[in-house]
From Swiss-Prot:
Pathway: Steroid metabolism; cholesterol degradation
MF terms in GO: cholesterol oxidase activity; isomerase activity
PANTHER family to which the protein is assigned, alphabetical: CHOLESTEROL OXIDASE (PTHR47470), FAD-DEPENDENT OXIDOREDUCTASE 2 FAD BINDING DOMAIN-CONTAINING PROTEIN (PTHR47470:SF1)
Catalytic residue positions: H471 (proton acceptor)
Residues binding FAD, per UniProt: G18, E37, G88, A93, V235, G504
Protein name: Cholesterol oxidase
Record InterPro entries: 4Fe4S_Fe-S-bd, Cholesterol_Oxidase, FAD/NAD-bd_sf, GMC_OxRtase_C
Family under the similarity heading: Belongs to the GMC oxidoreductase family.
Record has Metal-binding as a keyword: no
Length: 556
């Protein structure tokens, strides 16, 4: 088979940070690229006014909800992710941080590469492409977090977040449109940030540097084809070559239709899984169990991490309060060496997440905390009910996104659950993840009392002892052998050729910070190992020519 028999050189599953970077760099190297994305393409004018419009916010196609925000519930954790052209960048909080250096000495990837020497250049390129800068707009939530830090003696740790936002020039109001400010005029026109707080509900001002404005934009400009609302249902090696050395046959269908699945088959030379940590794990489990890719490492699904995360906050009642102004995450403090707290907000009117929050009760995780929660309802029914009312939640609430570097993980498996025996579903196993972070809860209660607010947590934490996370990592970890991970130090799937994993599932340790920048930098690194197409063709020609000469010598 020759390369001309393929529909594409590379087929990429997913258009998030890993997929968009891969598409951009591969098209630059001359390859033909297809990107399969389950979600829809969104423009600034398409986003809903607020997140009460569930049909345009939640992604649940089986219920005819075609938004971009996905929430998946497991026994051990509730995971938030994004489904859209541009992946999680459409709905993430726009925060891009470099993790501490020690993470490269930990986990499965420690001996897979010389990370500390290699990664700085890739972080720098990722920051350049994503337009990362210090937050320049401090809203009331940021000023309040600074006061809180000072009140408990950690004010010196307060700092602005690093965000991918196009801010207005000093002294100018946001909302003005400019020609591309990042790529010498080669990129799209951009609008400046208005500090509306709507980063996580879709930026309506073209100020958020989502992937469709940088990596994916240039990938399409260079010829990549993005197939939206398309789900990959099968990937199997071509021509009976079990290791994929001849490429793969990929079957796709429509992700948004109940009945008209629009099945289609593609012949491709290489496949890159970039479907998010959960999406890639689930897909590889199904392909392994169905026999399409049976030699995927048995380590698949192991050590899924969450940044040891917790969502807390303080709610301030009153008409004059407005914590919604600013970027989604504008500042942070460290309350101790391991515990990082970020000031987080939603746009005014986007109060739907308030349904997931409740009054913070004292006590340790488990039934005693439920008892204290019910006792609070009896003792303070008026405050309790106000805390449970989502109306004005975004304006009144300073949300704390708490993260730690503590290494805790669960395992994912594809199996039949007792309550749904009709098909296999992705399920969590292992020890409980840390939910109750004592120092973070103590800080929240203390500053709430000091600043006349009320401490808040999530209802899943109180009732089910289950944490929330937007940072699902691992499950297809980078490692030096298939006994310890799923991909090698260059993101190549063990036991296969021409098969890669480039997304959050590749992370081999707990980062302790928002992972998007690290995923981007690792994707840059993975693509740097793939030579330009013309180089491969020259090598193939030389090899064929040499083989012909050798054959001629033998026959002579």
């Amino acid at each position: 088979m020759t390369i001309n028999n393929y529909d594409y050189d590379y087929l990429i599953i997913g258009s998030g940070f890993g997929g968009s970077v891969s598409a951009c760099r591969l098209t630059e190297k001359g390859y033909s690229v297809a990107v399969m994305e389950m979600g829809r393409r969104w423009k600034a004018e398409d986003f809903a006014k607020n997140n009460w419009n569930t049909r345009r916010w939640i992604w649940r196609p089986g219920m005819k909800l075609f938004g971009y925000f996905n929430m998946r519930f497991f026994r051990h954790v509730t995971i938030i992710c994004g489904n859209a052209v541009g992946g999680g960048s459409i709905t993430y909080a726009n925060t891009l941080l470099v993790p501490p250096e020690h993470i490269w000495d930990e986990g499965t990837w420690a001996d897979a590469a010389d990370w500390k020497n290699e990664m700085p250049q890739h972080y720098a390129e990722a920051e350049r492409m994503l337009g990362v800068t210090d937050n320049k707009i401090f809203g009331p939530a940021d000023h309040m977090l600074k006061k809180m830090g000072e009140a408990v003696g950690v004010g010196h740790t307060f700092k602005p977040t690093r965000v991918a936002t196009f801010f207005p020039p000093e002294g100018e109001e946001g909302g003005k449109t400019y020609p591309d400010p990042y790529f010498n005029g080669e990129g799209p026109d951009r609008g400046t940030c208005t500090a509306c707080g709507g980063c996580m509900t879709g930026c309506k001002h073209n100020a958020k540097n989502t992937l469709d404005k940088n990596y994916l934009y240039f990938a399409e400009k260079n010829g990549a084809k993005v197939y939206e609302e398309t789900k990959v249902v099968d990937v199997k090696p071509l021509n009976g070559k079990a290791d994929g050395s001849d490429g793969y046959e990929v079957t796709t269908g429509c992700s948004s239709s109940w009945f008209n699945k629009q099945r289609r088959t593609w012949r491709v030379r290489n496949v890159i899984f970039s479907a998010s940590s959960l999406g890639t794990q689930e897909m590889l489990f199904r392909l392994k169990q169905s026999g399409s890719l049976p030699n995927i490492s048995d380590d698949l699904g192991n050590r899924v991490r969450t940044n040891a995360e917790s969502i807390l906050g303080v709610r301030f009642f009153g008409k004059d309060v407005d914590m919604s102004k600013g970027v989604a995450i504008g500042s942070s403090i460290y309350i101790d060496h391991d515990t990082h707290i970020e000031a987080t907000r939603y746009q005014s009117g986007s109060d739907a997440m308030g349904l997931m929050c409740t009054y913070m009760a004292k006590g340790k995780p488990g039934w005693t905390r439920i008892f204290f929660w019910l006792w609070a309802l009896i003792c303070h029914p008026f405050i309790f009910l106000r805390m449970s009312n989502p109306v004005s939640f975004a304006r009144q609430t300073l949300i704390f996104l708490v993260m730690q570097t503590a290494d805790a993980s669960i395992n994912m498996r594809l199996k039949r659950n007792w309550f749904w025996p009709f098909g296999k579903v992705l399920s969590s196993e292992g020890k409980k993840l840390p939910v109750y972070i004592p120092q973070a809860n103590a800080f929240t209660e203390k500053v709430a009392k000091m600043f006349n607010g009320h401490p808040m947590t999530t209802i899943t934490e109180i009732l089910f002892n289950v944490p929330f996370t937007a940072h699902c990592m691992g499950g297809c970890a980078i490692a030096s052998s298939p006994e310890r991970g799923v991909v090698d130090g260059q993101n190549r799937v063990f036991n296969y050729k021409n098969l890669y994993v480039v997304d959050g599932s590749m992370l081999g340790a707990n980062l302790g910070v928002n992972p998007s920048l690290t995923i981007t930098a690792l994707a840059e690194r993975a693509m740097s190992y793939i030579p330009a197409k013309h180089t491969l063709e020259e090598q193939a020609y030389t090899q064929t020519h040499n083989e012909v000469l050798e054959a001629a010598k033998v026959s002579a």
